[in-house]
Curated annotation (Swiss-Prot):
Similarity section: Belongs to the JHDM1 histone demethylase family.
Sequence ranges assigned to domain JmjC in this UniProt record: 588-746
Recorded name of the encoding gene: jhd1
Protein name: JmjC domain-containing histone demethylation protein 1
Molecular function GO labels: DNA-binding transcription factor activity, RNA polymerase II-specific; histone demethylase activity; histone H3K36me/H3K36me2 demethylase activity; transcription coregulator activity; zinc ion binding
Source organism of this protein record: Aspergillus fumigatus (strain ATCC MYA-4609 / CBS 101355 / FGSC A1100 / Af293)
Amino acid sequence: MIGATSFLNHSGPRPPRYRTPSPPRRAVEPISPFTTTTDFRASWIDRGDSQAASYDRDRVTSNNDVYSSTNRGSHGRTSHGRSSSTIDTLATIALATSPTFAPLSYRPPSQDPTPAMPLFPSQSIESTERPAKRPRSEKSPSPLHQPQTTVAPDANPSSTFDSMKTDAELLLNFARPSNFQPAAFYPSKRVSIDESYHPHYGEEPKSHFRAGLGSTYILPDGEKSAYHTSANTAFPASRMRSQSDGSAFISRPVIQGVRPNTSSSTLPPIVWQEEEGNAKTGPGPPSTKFPGAETRYENSVFTGIDTGADRASLDVPPRGDDDTESDENNQANCAACNLVRIPVDSEEQGDVTWISCDGCKQWFHIVCAGFKNDREIRTVDKFICRRCRPIHGQTTFVRKSSRARTAIDYAGLNQGLVKAASDSLEHHYIEPIREGKIRFLPDNFPRMRPELVTAEYFERGSGMTEPIVIPAHLNTRDSIPIVDPEFDSLVQEATSQEMFDELLEHLPEEGKDFETVIDCGQDQLDMVVPQGLTVRAVAELYGPEERVEVIDVKSQQGEDKRWNMQKWADYYESTGSKVVRNVISLEVSQSKLGKLIRRPKIVRDLDLQDAVWPEELKAIGDYPKVQFYCLMSVADCYTDFHIDFGGSSVYYHILKGKKTFFFIPPKDKHLKKYEDWCNSPAQDSTFLGDQTKECYRVDLSEGDTMLIPSGWIHAVWTPTNSLVIGGNFLTRLNYGMQIKVAKIEKDTKVPRKFRYPFFQRIQWYTALKYLEDDPIPQSVLNAFAEDENYRFHRAYPIYYEFGERENKAPAGDPYHNSRFYSQAELEGLPDLAKYLLRTALIASGYMVEGVTMDARNAVKRSIPKGQGDPIDTVRKFGIWVAWKRGNEKAPQWTRPGVVESNAKLSLTEKKPAGRPSRRSERNAEGQRMYAERQAVQRPLEQPPDLTNGLSSEESSSAPSTVEIPQSTVISTLPGTETKELKEEIAQKPRSIHRSSGLGPKRVACDACRKRRIRCRHKDEHNDTISAKQTTFGTFPAGVQSSLAHDAASALNSLAAIASEAGFQDAANGHGLERLEGSGNYSTAILSTPNAATSKVHDGSPEGLNTGKKGRSKACDDCRKSKRRCIHDEYGRIDPIKAQERSKPRATASAKRPRPPQEEDAAFTLNKRPKQESTSPVARPASLFRAEGDMSHTQRPVDLEASSYFGTAHDHNGIAQTKLTSAVGQTSYASPPAFQSDTVVMEVAGQGVSKPTASLVSPPTSQADETDVPPEQDAEKDNHVVYYTPTTSSRHSSRQPRHVDRYVPESQPAKAVKTTHTPSKRRASCSGPTTARRVTPGAQGSSKKPASRPSSSHAKKGVSPVTEKKFDRMTTTSTSPGHKGAKRERTAIADDEPDAESLRLIRELQEQEFGLRKRTTRV
C-alpha cells in the first residue's frame, strides 16, 4: 500500500475541514452512461443546439460573474443564459430529455465496446485540461488514466417513457424510492453535493442521485461505470491514496444494494444561487454550504448506477489501449459507489483518499471501503474488497508486535524537547534546561549564616526538613577577632611574663564566648577543604593508577572501559568536543586526600553512624565509608533524579565551577511517582519534574555549601567544569524517611553496591545504644509487663526539656534522660522499632513472606553478635520507645509469647537453607499483600524420633502454624461402637513446605509442581507426621479428627504396596517374624466414615520417605533410580527397611502411566500405585470365609497394649506389617493377599481360582474400606476385607489393576486372592450399583455414610450393626495363620493371571459401578 496521492487541485488555500463537491452549473444534470469524447461530439451534432443550452452548465455567467466568456471560449462552447431554476423549467427540461433516457431495467454488462448515445454529449473536451487525478508514477497510474470502455446504447426503447416519468418525479421531489431511508439529520436547506452519499462498508456498488443537481450519470441495467477497472488492466498492486473525502463519510446514508433515493423529500433542497458574498473568485464553481460548516469546494462528481447485487466478479468489457481519451476525460470512479469526479481547472489537489483492492485492482474511496480516516488505512497490509474476499481472503493488517517497546515522543523530538540519540554528545535534557524550555519553581529554601547551622538548631526545632544553602560570602575562612585593637596593642607592648599574664587575667568579657582552636584553614562551618584543589591534585593524592568509576552522562550508565585517575585527569583537562562523562562516586576517606578533609561540625554532630558505631571497629577501619566523596564533572554533565542511598542526608561544597539542583520534595505522592518512574521503561525519556508538577531549581556557585535532608529527590546539572567535595550521613532526625527510602531501593531493585553499606547494622547499633546509654528502670519494665494497657505518664513530651524545663532527674529515676531527645527523633522511633522487629523475625528463623534465603542470611549477618536473642532485644526496645514517648501503650508484639502465638503471625516448619524456587521468586512481587496477612511463619522443630507423639496442646499452641495431621486411632474391640465411627472429619487446608518464604503457600506436590500441572495430591502431605502418631500411641478425640482423610489415603497406599509387591521370603512363612518384635507394625484402621489411619511409622516394608512432600514417598535418589527406598525421612538408611527384600518389579511399560483404554491390553501388578486422593476414607468391612459364611472368631486385639508397643501376638504380624508398608499409596488391599476394588478368594481344593468375594463397591460407599484380616485357621479360615476409600485418587487410572492370582493346589486353603483396582476408576462412581457378587457364599454389606448417597449394595443377612462390629474385629483381630501370609504371597507371585482374565474383571467392575474412563495427564 503506497502513500496518499492527491489527484485534484483547488484554487485558493485549502479549507481546514473536508471539502464538499462543487455544485452543478446547470439546471439539470445529464443522466446517461459515460462516453468518450468522440461520442459526445458526435451525439452533440445529432441532437442540435437545443440540448446544448442545457449542457452548458459548466460555464454560467448569468447571476454569477465567476465564470467568464474566455473560459467558455477556451472550451469551444457556446455561451448561454442560465435558467431561473424554477420548478416549471426543471419539469420542462426533464420532459424534453425523456426520449434519450435509459430504461430503468438493468441488464448484464455488455461486452460490446460500442459507445452509448449520450444524453448531453460533450461539445469538446480539450486535451489540455489537467487530469482530475494525477498519476503518482508510471508504474502506479491513476484510475483516471486507464483505457475507457464505452457502453452500448440500450436497445429497448419501450421503457423510455417510464424512465422519463420516474426520473422527472424523482427530480421534482414528487416521488421517492420506497427502499431509501431519509437522512433525517439534515437541519438546513443547504446541502453539499455529496450529502446523499454515505459510505457503504460492504463495498457494494451503488448509484446516487444528487437531488436533481450535479453531474450524475445513470447507467443502464447491469452496466458498469465506464471507469470500473478490469482485472486484466495493468493496475499496480499498490494503492494510491490522498486525504479523506470527509464530507462523503459524514452524511451519506448506508444503502444495502438498492438504488438510492434522490427525491428532494428526503434531502433538503439545495439553493442554486448563493448570495454574492459566498461566491469565490477564480476558476471555481459557486459554493454551497454544509449545515454548520464553512464553505467548501470540491469538483463535480459523476456517479454511475451499478447493480452489483447479482454480479460475482468485477470483470468489465475490455478497454482499448488508447491513453489519449483517458487523458482527455481525466475521470475516476469508485468501484463501490461509482462516484465519478470531473476535473476543473484548479491548481490545488482534491481531498479524496483512495484505496486499491489487491485482488481485483479496483479503486475505492476509503469511506466506501469501510475506513473512517487515513489513520485506519495505515494499519492495512493488503486490502481485499467484499467481492474478492471469497477468492483472496480477508483484508490483512500490518502485524503489531506485542513486545513492550520504548515509546518515542516524536512531538517532543519535533519541538526539540527531546534530542535524538545521534544528535548530540550531551544528555537530551541539557538543551531544554539551558534554553529554559523546562519550567521549574523558584526555590524558597533558606540561606543561613554558618554560625546558625548547628545540631542544636535542628534538634530543638522541627528538624532538618528542607535543603539549606550556606552562601560563600557568609562562610569565610577569616578568624573571628575576640579582642579590640587597644588590648592587642597592650599585649604587644608587654615586656615581661608577669605583665602578659596580668593582661590575660583581665581579658575582655566578650572573648570568653569563643573557643580557641587550631587554625587549619577551616571555615565557619568548621569544615576543612584544601584550597586550590584541582582534579590533577586529586589524582595524585588518590593515586594515579587507582581505579575510578566513570559514568557516561548520555546513557546514565557506567563506562565499560577501565578508567584510572591518571586517565580521568587527562580527560578532564582535555578540550574540544568529547563524550560527556562524570565521576560522582569516588570515596576518598581512606586516601591521602581524605586525611586533608574535615566535614562540617553539624554533619559530625548529626551523623548517626559516628554516634553508634563501636569505637573498636572504627579503630581498625571497619565502618561504612561514605563520609568523603570527590565529584568531578565536566560541563553539561547531568545526573537524573535520584535519592541518596539509604535516605541519607548530604553535605555538598562547591570547590570549583557551578552546580544546578532540581529538587522534588519527599511527599508520599512524589515518592510513589518516583518509584513508578524508576520501574518505567520510559525512564530515560520522562522528566520526573513534569510528572510531579513540583520541582524547584537551586543554583550553586563556587564556595557555596548546601545541606540536603533525607529523602529529597534531586537531579544535578553541571553548567561548567566543577569540583565538589561532599558526603552522606544518616541522622536521628529522619528514621522514618531513611527506612522508607531503603524499602524503595529494595522495591526498585537497586543493586546492593549502590545502597548504604551496613544500613541494618547501624539501626541495630542505634537501638543497642539507646538501651545501653539510657536503660529502662526495672520498675517501668515491670509495669509494662504486668499490664498490657500500661502507659507511662508524662506531663509534656521530653523534647520540651531544655532551657528552663531541662530535666535534672538523677540516673535510675523513671524520668531521667541521659541526653536531649528531639521531636523528630521521638517521632521516628516507632518506625525504627518496627523495622528492627522485622529483621529480628527474619534472623530468628521466622518465615517472613517475601524473604529469600540469601536475604535471610544477610539479615542474620547484619545483627550484632553477642547481644542475646534479637527478639528479646527488639521487645525491650519497643518498651523503651513507649517509655520515652510517654502516654502510650507498648506495642502488642512486646508482650511475652505474642510473637509466637499471635494469630497474625503464621508459623511453619523450618526448612534447611537452599536455593529458593524460581517460581517463588517470581511471585514475590505479586504476593506482597499476602505477605502482610501472613506476616511470619515460625518453624516447628520435628525431632527424628517421636516418643510420645504430638500432643494436642502442642498443636494448638501455634494457631497459625501449618496444620499438622493428627491421626485418629480407635481401639475397636468386639461388640463396641464408638462415636468416632460416625464422625465426618473435615479436611483442613495445609501447605507443603518450601525452602523459601517467597510467594504463596504451596499446596502442590513436587511432581505436579515440576510438571506445572494442577495438583490433586493435597491430602497426602500430612501423612508423614500422622504416621508417627499412629505408631506410638492413641491421641485424644479432638486430635483424632484433624486429618482423617489423609489417614485413609495412607491406608489405601499401604494395602496397595502390600498387595502388589508382597514379601518375598521363603515358603516357610517366617519372613516377618523379625519385624514383629519391634512393635512397629500395628493395625490402625479408623472406623470413622471419612477418616482412616494416617501413615504409621518409618519402618514399613515399603520404606516410606515421610520427609518428602505430596505423593513422593521415596527419596529423590531412590525414586529417580527406580529402586526401593530404604531411607527414612531424614535421608538416613533405615535398618528395618534395609533388611526387607526387594520386591518384584514390573515391566518398564507398567511403570509408565497409561490411559484407561490402554489398560485393557496389559496390566502390571507390581507397579507402585500413586496416591492422589483428595478425601480418602478407610472403613473396615466384613470378612468372608471361602465357603461364604462369616467368621466372628477373630481375637480382639488391644491396640495400645499389643500393636503400639510390640506386644502383639504372632497373628498380628502380617496384617499390621502390610498396613505400614506404603503409607499414602492409593490401594485397597491388605496382606496376606492382593486386594483392591475387586476381591476374589480362592476356594480351597480348587486348582483354578474363582471369585469368592464381591467386587468392591464404588467410592460412594465408605463401609467397604476394610483390610484383610488375619486368618484364624491357617487351613480353612481365609477371609477377605474390603478396603475402599470414599473419594479416591484422581490420577490412579495410571496405575495398573491388581487382580487375583492363581494359587497352586498345594496351598488351597491359604490362597486368599484379591485384585486391585486404582481408585481413580472408582472415584467417578456415584450412581447406584449392583449387589456384591460373592461366589459362592454370603457377602458383607456396606455401611453407607450419612453424607454420601446410597451405594445400593446388597446386604445379605448382615445388619449394619453386626457389620460395624465385625468391621472392628477384622481390623484388629489376628490369628497364628497370619504369619504364613508371606509364604502364600511368595507362592502365588509366580502365577500371573492372563490378560483376558484381567480384562474381564475390569469390564465387570466398570459395568457394576458405572465407572467411566479418564484420560491420564501426560
